[in-house]
Amino acid sequence: MLVTFSIVAPIFNELDNLPELYRRVREVMSAAGATWELVLVDDGSTDGSTDAILQLAKRDKHVRPVIFARNFGHQVAITAGWDFARGEAVVIIDADL
């Protein structure tokens, strides 16, 4: 599938913010009518974010998880998301909106 937009969000202990992040991205991208993916890069979270990301990915093919075994930092998470992104355009956003 050709992807127009890749939205990359580094995640570190953002369990409470993930549902709203997903909802808003899905709402905006669906309204735009473009093909898209949401690359969620879990940077060693310890609050359940990892499991939440994996569950979202099971339910929605737009969600692409990238899971780190430990915390490498914000910039490394962004770089990994960029590397995994398949879109013609890549948008970086923070999970806390």
Please annotate each region the language model reported.
Residues 1-97:
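Structured catalytic core of nucleotide-sugar glycosyltransferases
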